[in-house]
């Protein structure tokens, strides 16, 4: 076969693909994914509280906002403490850590616009602005001690994730009161939850399992995809 050489002018025209050849160009559309982690079993017993994080993706960048009790803790059931926000730039790094607990994480993905994604990034940037950066314990992540402490009811992984989700998906938790029942909590924990609110049940949804029930039922926003990560309890 004769070798054909192309001049610079020909190269500038680009590569022509024959009509019978098929090619696939994959474009990443802006997406927000609510990640809800389930219970898991550890050496010290069952951990039923669950976890939640928010993943935001565009064609240019990806962030997973992961808030939790990653610092000093205290209070009843260790439900209070330093508010630590981890910001991951690689999903596999984040989810491999969650999978290592033996839990299942369910991801609810929604299409958004680039502008909406940028607003979510800006939302968390404003939270981080007043934070103290800490040395990260994990690759592909940065860690911040926020000005506001962690609280198991009023400022936890679920409330932090929903605060960003609402920026892109206004009203996603508008009917959350119907699902705010404390799934994953023991009876003593529920009594303590009422105690922190002067005997009344907290008004805002705060348990990851309750958020999952809401996302699985409500139709204001229908996820483009629901994906399960990890093998769950054995």
Where are each of the predicted segments found?
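Substrate-binding/catalytic groove segments of enzymes
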Residues: 167-177
